[in-house]
């Protein structure tokens, strides 16, 4: 039990740190899970999804005032209503593909080799886009054009491949379609809410009968750790990318992916 608590804390930290950075939380959790020899254990696979609720609540707590204002104005304020529609438009492509092909993606693509290659390729793309002279025209994540929300949602579908990164795909797409770095990152936070809530509800419902009291305790620990870590990371991340961009995270992806491939080639 103590070792399970230790693993829950480590995985909670990994989830909280990586969920909103463009480095792929799923990819990092798969690699850390391999280090802990979690293998095909169905509980730990579900654990990785369930502790995302902590990260979701971190976003809700940080942006509570803004989201509450949007919710209250949804029926009276055209701008608020338009943003809600935009988030739904961005969410739907991934929701539809996940419903149709989610089980096949997990079966065939959830392995460390795919993660490492995706980390490297995604890192190279992020580095390239970060260094482009894009002359951004969109500076408010709640006021993008509706077609732009849809394009970002389509790009997010690529993140179903482990190692691509949900936030990374949406940030790159947002920047290519005219968003500045801060608003691109901020919209990736907002888009995470329906995407991650959907994954959480689906996984919890599917595995509700298999959860023991010990399992719930472990999940609760991971949840609290991921919440605290995510709050710290999100508050730091926006200021950092506004000043320095995404180069650090791009190189992090390339280095982790390369080291992972070396370890896999050595049979680790």
From Swiss-Prot:
Q: How does it sit in the membrane?
A: Multi-pass membrane protein
The protein's gene is named uppP
Q: What is its EC number?
A: 3.6.1.27
Q: What is catalysed by this protein? A: di-trans,octa-cis-undecaprenyl diphosphate + H2O = di-trans,octa-cis-undecaprenyl phosphate + phosphate + H(+)
User: What protein family does this chain belong to?
Assistant: Belongs to the UppP family.
Transmembrane stretches, by residue range?
Answer: 47-67, 83-103, 109-129, 144-164, 184-204, 218-238, 246-266
Report the InterPro entries cross-referenced here. Answer: UppP
> What UniProt keywords are attached to this protein's entry?
Antibiotic resistance, Cell inner membrane, Cell membrane, Cell shape, Cell wall biogenesis/degradation, Hydrolase, Membrane, Peptidoglycan synthesis, Transmembrane, Transmembrane helix
> Might you report a single GO cellular component term?
plasma membrane
Annotated function:
Catalyzes the dephosphorylation of undecaprenyl diphosphate (UPP). Confers resistance to bacitracin.
Native species of this protein?
A: Rhodopseudomonas palustris (strain BisB5)
**Protein name in the entry:** Undecaprenyl-diphosphatase
> What remark does the entry add?
Bacitracin is thought to be involved in the inhibition of peptidoglycan synthesis by sequestering undecaprenyl diphosphate, thereby reducing the pool of lipid carrier available.
User: A Gene Ontology MF term for this entry?
Assistant: undecaprenyl-diphosphatase activity
What is the protein's major site of localization? membrane
Listed under GO biological process in this entry are:
cell wall organization; peptidoglycan biosynthetic process; regulation of cell shape; response to antibiotic
Q: Where in the cell is it found?
A: Cell inner membrane
Q: What's the superkingdom here?
A: Bacteria
